[in-house]
UniProtKB/Swiss-Prot annotation:
Protein name (record): Rho guanine nucleotide exchange factor 15
Protein function: Specific GEF for RhoA activation. Does not activate RAC1 or CDC42. Regulates vascular smooth muscle contractility. Negatively regulates excitatory synapse development by suppressing the synapse-promoting activity of EPHB2.
Naturally occurring in which organism (per UniProt): Homo sapiens
Biased composition (Pro residues): 111-124
Taxonomic lineage from the root: Eukaryota, Metazoa, Chordata, Craniata, Vertebrata
Domain named DH: residues: 417-601
Record's comment on post-translational modification: Phosphorylated on tyrosine residues upon EFNA1 stimulation. EPHB2-dependent phosphorylation at Tyr-353 triggers UBE3A-mediated ubiquitination. Ubiquitinated; UBE3A-mediated ubiquitination and degradation by the proteasome promotes EFNB1-dependent synapse formation.
GO MF entry, a single one: GTPase activator activity
Composition-biased stretches (Polar residues): 39-53
Domain of life: Eukaryota
Tissue: Expressed in the vascular smooth muscle of coronary artery.
InterPro entries for the chain: DBL_dom_sf (IPR035899), DH_dom (IPR000219), Ephexin-like (IPR047271), PH-like_dom_sf (IPR011993), PH_ephexin (IPR047270)
Cell compartment(s), UniProt: Cell projection, Dendrite
Residues covered by region (Disordered): 1-179, 239-261, 279-333, 765-793
GO process terms (BP): negative regulation of synapse maturation; positive regulation of stress fiber assembly; regulation of actin cytoskeleton organization; regulation of postsynapse assembly; regulation of small GTPase mediated signal transduction; retina vasculature morphogenesis in camera-type eye
Length: 841
C-alpha cells in the first residue's frame, strides 16, 4: 500500500509551539540509511522548491506499540518504591544494558506550555490513528531496534515540582535532509542518548553534539521517562474539597488503559532523602450546617494520585489519605466545630455600634419586666427580647449551638437572662469594633482626606483611635476564647476586670483630647472647604450608612460608659456570695475608675484650654507676673463688680465718690483682681491666695448690695481692703460664700501656698517679764518679731525677748493660721476701741 492511498494525518486539537533550532555551522549530513519500510509505507517525493533542490519529507506513520512495552505506570501498586520503578526498562529500548556515560547537557528554562489530552492508541493497520512522523532506526550495535515508544513533541514543555524540562524535536534519522514547516533543515538524530536505568540508546536519541535545548548540559540531572498525561513520582497530597465552593480545576481527559510514553523532564540525581518532605495542608473547616447537620462534604474529583493518574469522577475513587476532618473524622471533630465555628460566624453580621446604641434606647422605651429585663411571652418559653425592626445584635438563644445543645430546656429563666446579659458584652464589643474599623479604614487611612489636612490637624482630629482599636481587638479575642469553651458561658467579668486595670487606660488618653477634637472639627468645617467636601463624600458611602464623623469620634467614651451599665445589669442578677458577684464587683469598680478618670480628664482639659485663652488676655502692669496655667488649677467663678473709692479734691472741693469697674477671677487656689481694658484685655491689679481672702457684707439697706473684700496678704505681702458693689443680691451671696468668714478656726489643716515677709516664732517655754523686758511669754504663743539684734534678741509685737525661748515657724499652714488669728484680733480690738488699726495692748 502506497503513501498516496493513506489519509492525511489528523492534526492535534492543540498544536504545541515548535522551537526552531539553529543549524550547526559545520556538520556533515548523515547518509540516508535505507531501512525496512515501516507498515509498508514509503517516502513520497514533494514538489521541488524554487531552487530545484529535493526536499524529501516523511509521510504519516501508523504504528501500534508492542503490548509488552506499554505497561502503564499507573498499574503499579501505590506502595511501590522508587527503586522498583527505576529498575524497569525504558519502554523504547529492547534491552536493559546500562550506558557508560550520559550525554552532557546545558541547563535551559523554557516557558511551560499547557498539556493537551492524548488520544489512546488504535490497533495496527487502523487508518484512523496517525502518529507523529517516526521511523525505525538502528541502535549503536548496528541491530535494528524495536519500534520506538517515544513520541516526538516539538516545543512541548512540562512544569512540575522539580522544574520539568523540555521535549525537543526528534526528526526521523532515516532521511538525510528534511525541511520543517519553516524551511529550516534538521540534522538526523543518530547519536546515543542516556536513559534512566542505562538502557540502550533509543531510536530517536539525539547525536552527541545535538544543539537542541532539551539535551544541553544540566549538571546533577539525568533523563527521565514518564507516562503521557502523568507526573513524576513526587509525593502528592490531595486538596480537601469544600462543600461551600465549586471546583475551579481544569477538566481532565478520561484515564486511558495503555498510555504512550513521552520524554517530559529531567530529574535530579540527588538522593531522595535530601529533599524536604511535603507536609499536607491543614484542612479547611466547613460550616456546621454542611458537616454536622447536613451531608458529608464530597472531595474534589480532579485530584491526582501519587503516580500522576487521574483518580476518576466518582466519589468512591477518592484518595485513601483524605484528611479525617472531611470523610472519616467527622464525628470526632463535630464538637470542636460546634464550639468554635458557630460562635464566630454570627458576630460578622453585627450592626454598627451607633445602630446598636439606638436599638438599646428603643428597647428601654418598649418596656421591660419587673426585674429589669424583658419578660417572655409565655412562662415556659425562652425569654424573647422585643426588638424594633431593623438591624439588631445576635441573641444568645438564637445561636445554633445553643439550640442544638438543649440548654434552653434545662436552664432556668433567671440563668437564661444571665446568659443573655453576658453575651451582650460580646456582641456589643463586636459592633463597637466594627464601627472602629470603619472609622479607621474610611476616614483615618483615607489619603484624599489626609491631603486636605495638616499633620497637626489630622492628629488632633483622630488622636490615638488606632490604639483604641487594637485594645478592642484583643479584648474581643479574649472574650471569644472564653465563649468558645462551651455554649454555656461561665463568666466574663474577670476578663473585663483584667483589661480594665491594664489596657483600658488608653481610653483616658483618647477622651482627654475630646475638647480639642470638637474645636478642631468645628474650625475645619467652617474654614476648610476641601475638607468639608471630601468628608461629605465619605459619609455618603453606603458602608457608612450616612452617619456623621462626630458619631464615630464619640464611640470610645460611649463604649466605656455602656460597659459599666452592662456590668451593673450582670451584678444585679448574680447570686449573693458567688464568684460571679465578686468578679462583677471588681470589674464594675475598675471600669468606674476609668470613667471617673475620663470625666476628670475631660474637665481638666477644658479648664486648661480656658486658662490658656485667659492667659492671652491678661496684662501684668506694675505687678509681678504669675504663671497661671497649671494642671491643678481651675477657674471656678468670675464676675464683674464695681469698686467704691474716694477721689480727694482740692481746698475748695470736698472728696467725692469714685466708681471703678473690676473683674474678679476666682480660681481653685487664687484670686485675681483685674480691670477691663480695650480689646477684651484684662489688666491685673492685685492677687492673693484664696485662703488669705475674706469677704464681709456691709449693712446698707438703702443702697445696692455691698461687701468688703480683704486680702490678708497680697502679692506684696501687705493687707489690702476694697469695698465692692454687686449687680444683684444673688451675685453678692455667691462671692460671700466663696471665701471663709471670720469665726472659729477649722480643725482640718489648710493648704498653704504663699509666704509672708516677716518670720514667725513659737514660744517653746514660759518666761518671766524680767527676761522679756516687761512682757511675759506663754508656752505655745506665737509672737511676731520685726527685727533681730546681733545679741540674739528678737523685737516684735510682744516686745524684745531672747531667741532661745522661741523656735521659728516654718510650716505654711501654721503661718496662715497665725495671720488669720491676728486679723480677727485686730478687728475685735478696732470694733471695741473705735480705731480699726489699733495695735493690741
Amino acid at each position: 500500500m502506497s503513501a498516496q492511498s493513506l489519509p492525511a494525518a489528523t492534526p492535534p486539537t492543540q498544536k504545541p509551539p515548535r522551537i526552531i533550532r539553529p543549524r550547526p555551522p559545520s556538520r556533515s549530513r548523515a547518509a540516508q540509511s535505507p531501512g525496512p519500510p515501516h507498515n509498508g509505507s514509503s517516502p513520497q517525493e514533494l514538489p521541488r522548491n524554487s531552487n530545484d533542490a529535493p526536499t524529501p519529507m516523511c509521510t504519516p506513520i501508523f504504528w501500534e506499540p508492542p503490548a509488552a512495552s506499554l505497561k502503564p505506570p499507573a498499574l503499579l501498586p501505590p506502595s511501590a518504591s522508587r527503586a522498583s520503578l527505576d529498575s524497569q526498562t525504558s519502554p523504547d529500548s529492547p534491552s536493559s544494558t546500562p550506558t557508560p556515560s550520559p550525554v552532557s547537557r546545558r541547563s535551559a528554562s523554557p516557558e511551560p506550555a499547557p498539556r493537551s489530552p492524548v488520544p489512546p492508541p488504535k490497533p495496527s493497520g487502523s487508518p484512523c490513528t496517525p502518529l507523529l512522523p517516526m521511523a525505525g532506526v538502528l541502535a549503536q550495535n548496528g541491530s535494528a531496534s524495536a519500534p520506538g515508544t517515544v513520541r516526538r513533541l516539538a516545543g512541548r514543555f512540562e512544569g512540575g515540582a522539580e522544574g520539568r524540562a523540555q521535549d525537543a524535536d526528534a526528526p526521523e534519522p532515516g532521511l538525510q535532509a528534511r525541511a520543517d514547516v519553516n524551511g529550516e533543515r534538521e540534522a538526523p538524530l543518530t547519536g546515543s542518548g542516556s536513559q534512566e536505568n542505562g538502557a540502550p540508546d533509543a531510536g530517536l536519541a539525539c547525536p552527541p553534539c545535538c544543539p537542541c535545548v532539551c539535551h544541553t548540559t544540566r549538571p546533577g540531572l539525568e533523563l527521565r521517562w514518564v507516562p503521557v498525561g502523568g507526573y513524576e513520582e513526587v509525593p502528592r497530597v490531595p486538596r480537601r474539597a469544600s462543600p461551600l465552593r465549586t471546583s475551579r480545576s481544569r477538566p481532565h481527559p478520561p484515564s486511558i488503559g495503555h498510555p504512550a510514553v513521552v520524554l517530559t523532564s529531567y530529574r535530579s540525581t540527588a538522593e531522595r532523602k535530601l529533599l524536604p518532605l511535603l507536609k499536607p495542608p491543614k484542612p479547611t473547616r466547613v460550616r456546621q450546617d454542611a458537616t454536622i447537620f447536613g451531608d458529608p462534604p464530597q472531595p474534589d474529583l480532579d485530584l491526582l494520585s501519587e503516580d500522576g493518574i487521574q483518580t476518576g469522577d466518582s466519589p468512591d475513587e477518592a484518595p485513601q489519605n483524605t484528611p479525617p476532618a472531611t470523610v472519616e473524622g467527622r464525628e470526632e471533630e463535630g464538637l470542636e466545630v460546634l464550639k468554635e465555628q458557630n460562635w464566630e460566624l454570627p458576630l460578622q453580621d453585627e450592626p454598627l455600634y451607633q445602630t446598636y446604641r439606638a436599638a438599646v434606647l428603643s428597647e428601654e422605651l418598649w418596656g421591660v419586666g419587673e426585674d429589669g429585663s424583658p419578660s417572655p411571652a409565655n412562662a415556659g418559653d425562652a425569654p424573647t427580647f422585643p426588638r424594633p425592626p431593623g438591624p439588631r445584635n445576635t441573641l444568645w438563644q438564637e445561636l445554633p449551638a445553643v439550640q442544638a445543645s438543649g440548654l434552653l430546656d434545662t436552664l432556668s429563666p433567671q440563668e437564661r437572662r444571665m446568659q443573655e446579659s453576658l453575651f451582650e458584652v460580646v456582641t456589643s464589643e463586636a459592633s463597637y469594633l466594627r464601627s472602629l474599623r470603619l472609622l479607621t479604614d474610611t476616614f483615618v487611612l483615607s489619603q484624599a482626606l489626609r491631603d486636605t489636612l495638616t499633620p497637626r490637624d489630622h492628629h488632633t482630629l483622630f488622636s490615638n483611635v488606632q490604639r483604641v482599636q487594637g485594645v478592642s481587638e484583643r479584648f474581643l479575642a479574649t472574650l471569644l476564647s472564653r465563649v468558645r469553651s462551651s455554649p454555656h458561658i461561665s463568666d466574663l467579668c474577670d476578663v473585663v476586670h483584667a483589661h480594665a486595670v491594664g489596657p483600658f487606660s488608653v481610653y483616658v488618653d483618647y477622651v482627654r483630647n475630646q475638647q480639642y477634637q470638637e474645636e478642631t472639627y468645628s474650625r475645619l468645617m467652617d474654614t476648610n472647604v476641601r475638607f468639608s467636601a471630601e468628608l461629605r463624600r465619605l459619609q455618603s458611602l453606603p458602608k457608612c450608612e450616612r452617619l456623621p464623623l462626630p458619631s464615630f469620634l464619640l464611640l470610645p467614651f460611649q463604649r466605656i460608659t455602656r460597659l459599666r451599665m452592662l456590668l451593673q445589669n450582670i451584678l444585679r442578677q448574680t447570686e449573693e456570695g458567688s464568684s460571679r458577684q465578686e468578679n462583677a464587683q471588681k470589674a464594675l469598680g475598675a471600669v468606674s475608675k476609668i470613667i471617673e478618670r475620663c470625666s476628670a480628664e475631660v474637665g481638666r482639659m477644658k479648664q486648661t484650654e480656658e486658662l490658656i485663652r485667659l492667659t492671652q488676655r491678661l496684662r501684668f502692669h506694675k505687678v509681678k507676673a504669675l504663671p497661671l496655667v497649671s494642671w491643678s488649677r481651675r477657674l471656678e467663678f468670675q464676675g464683674e463688680l464695681t469698686e467704691l473709692g474716694c477721689r480727694r479734691g482740692g481746698v475748695l472741693f470736698a472728696s467725692r465718690p469714685r466708681f471703678t469697674p473690676l473683674c474678679l477671677l476666682l480660681f481653685s487656689d487664687l484670686l485675681l483682681i483685674t480691670q477691663p481694658k480695650s480689646g477684651q484685655r484684662l489688666q491685673v491689679l492685685d492677687y492673693a491666695h484664696r485662703s488669705l481672702v475674706q469677704a464681709q457684707q456691709v449693712p446698707d439697706p438703702s443702697g445696692p448690695p455691698t461687701f468688703r473684700l480683704s486680702l490678708l496678704s497680697n502679692h506684696q505681702g501687705r493687707p489690702t481692703h476694697r469695698l465692692l458693689q454687686a449687680s444683684s443680691l444673688s451675685d453678692m451671696q455667691r462671692w460671700l460664700g466663696a471665701f471663709p468668714t471670720p469665726g472659729p478656726l477649722p480643725c482640718s489643716p489648710d493648704t498653704i501656698y504663699e509666704d509672708c515677709d516677716c518670720s514667725q516664732e513659737l514660744c517653746s517655754e514660759s518666761s518671766a517679764p524680767a527676761k522679756t523686758e516687761g512682757r511675759s511669754l506663754e508656752s505655745r504663743a506665737a509672737p511676731k518679731h520685726l527685727h533681730k539684734t546681733p545679741e540674739g534678741w528678737l523685737k516684735g509685737l510682744p516686745g524684745a525677748f531672747p531667741a532661745q525661748l522661741v523656735c521659728e515657724v516654718t510650716g505654711e499652714h501654721e503661718r496662715r493660721r497665725h495671720l488669720r488669728q491676728n486679723q480677727r484680733l485686730l478687728e475685735a480690738v478696732g470694733s471695741s476701741s473705735g480705731t480699726p488699726n489699733a495695735p493690741p495692748p
